[in-house]
Amino acid sequence: MDKRHDPSRRIIAPTGTKLSCKSWLTEAPMRMLMNNLHPDVAERPEDLVVYGGIGRAARDWECYDKIVEVLQRLEDDETLMVQSGKPVGVFKTHSNAPRVIIANSNLVPHWANWEHFNELDKKGLAMYGQMTAGSWIYIGSQGIVQGTYETFVAMAKQHFNGVSAGKWILTGGLGGMGGAQPLAGTMAGYSVLTCEVDETRIDFRLRTKYVDKKATSLDEALAMIEEANNSGKPVSVGLLANAADVFAELVERGITPDVVTDQTSAHDPLNGYLPQGWTLEYAAEMRKKDEAAVVKAAKQSMAVQVKAMLALQAAGAATTDYGNNIRQMAFEEGVENAFDFPGFVPAYVRPLFCEGIGPFRWVALSGDPEDIYKTDAKVKELIPDNPQLHNWLDMARERIAFQGLPSRICWVGLKDRARLALAFNEMVKNGELSAPIVIGRDHLDSGSVASPNRETESMLDGSDAVSDWPLMNALLNTASGATWVSLHHGGGVGMGFSQHSGVVIVADGTDDAAVRLGRVLWNDPATGVMRHADAGYDIAKNCAKEQGLDLPML
């Protein structure tokens, strides 16, 4: 019997102001853990899988139940330790310490590979936490919509003189992360064709308004794209097909998209990528019989897809890796020039990271969408001179369906995060908001990740693989008084390729919370400015100077 599978479970977080725990500082992590497993949020909630292949919220259902039980009895001077999704200890700390400290999927470097992890996983000794799955701050596909939108806008500026109208994007994957690309693309003015092998995922994205139409053949999908481009109204199409097949067929036909990328779960060749010619059912059987054969077949198909991406790049498509490590997988399968197209961070996002700008997100524990709309207005009030941000907030309200607890994400940096958090806390205090707000971020941020094939690819000083930075980030956020802190390995790009940390803090309207919020939400993005300034980026050095950071070696 698989202790991780229970189709009878239907988890929905409590809403309103009635507490199940002893304070909001423990109620918040409990609700956010539950929200990660909401049926409208998680990819496979019955298996505790939130997103990203096998990114889980808890190691098994027994561990999940025990985490909830402990949070409900935890005092405000105690800290729960969670080791790879398992609650292993409660310790006396103090009221400004984190209520939960989480470590997921971490392995000694020599053993940091999928083979060793999968053995531990089968024995019930480990859990893959992805980034926000095991750190309980996943908010559905909205979580990366704005970052993806900003990337596509940057691509239009860089490649198409700022004009995306009449252009189209080819990509793959409609899981929790990939599902953001169709909506982000149409928001940025492109049409989008996304390949997906699992029809239930296409239907999920249709239901949550991330995809406009479904197609079952390439010809049908291309006709939809052509019609949209002719009409001037962008459309997103979910095509039921294998990305490797479609990408290669487009090369064969001589059809070149304007933008090419991919967000299948290529980071996990065993669980995340369907080989060409295989059905989902056959892949599930093969995973039980011969894992090595599955991995080999998946990597062979990834090689086909990456070769097609390179060919489309040569034909004129703006081509980028969107952070799923597909280039590495293809390289290991013999595609020697797999890295000839860039990752999206060095190509489009790094200047933002240099100013500590990244995916700031917040969640209304009340469950009331009005709380989010009020915070949207507060963001506009406090940041009046950023039309791109205002445009994003307007589009998000109009086009993004909340999944689970109402939430919002917007990319803001060092100079704004603490200001916004303190304003939200004041809104809770004076009753403008009906319940506390949880504030967090993705692990994909400026100072919280070491990932040489993604966030820290091609660093100016060659420090791509130095992972001291996310470790220091987690330690500093713990010392600063975050409500929960996490340290993970392997998120986004798979085992052996990344280390990263997460932070979440509660704005409960108290004066103590204001002190913690001011510290945490200054220090956290400041570590990103520090990291990039140390690597030699002038934008980061100037930001550090302007914001008065004390960086002794600069």
Curated annotation (Swiss-Prot):
Superkingdom of the source species: Bacteria
Reported function: Catalyzes the conversion of urocanate to 4-imidazolone-5-propionate.
Family indicated by similarity: Belongs to the urocanase family.
Keyword NAD: yes
Organism, scientific name: Shewanella halifaxensis (strain HAW-EB4)
Molecular function per GO: urocanate hydratase activity
Cofactors that this protein relies on: NAD(+)
PROSITE patterns reported in the protein's UniProt record: UROCANASE (PS01233)
Catalytic activity: 4-imidazolone-5-propanoate = trans-urocanate + H2O
Details of cofactor binding: Binds 1 NAD(+) per subunit.
Subcellular location, record wording: Cytoplasm
Enzyme class at the top of the EC tree: lyase
InterPro entries noted in UniProt: Urocanase, Urocanase-like, Urocanase_C, Urocanase_central_sf, Urocanase_CS, Urocanase_N, Urocanase_Rossmann-like, Urocanase_sf
Gene Ontology process terms (BP): L-histidine catabolic process to glutamate and formamide; L-histidine catabolic process to glutamate and formate
GO-annotated cellular components: cytoplasm
Protein residues bound to NAD(+): 52-53, 130, 176-178, 196, 201, 242-243, 263-267, 273-274, 322, 492
Protein name: Urocanate hydratase
Pfam families, per the entry: Urocanase (PF01175), Urocanase_C (PF17392), Urocanase_N (PF17391)
Protein EC: 4.2.1.49
UniProt pathway: Amino-acid degradation; L-histidine degradation into L-glutamate; N-formimidoyl-L-glutamate from L-histidine: step 2/3
Keywords: Cytoplasm, Histidine metabolism, Lyase, NAD
Active site, UniProt feature: 410
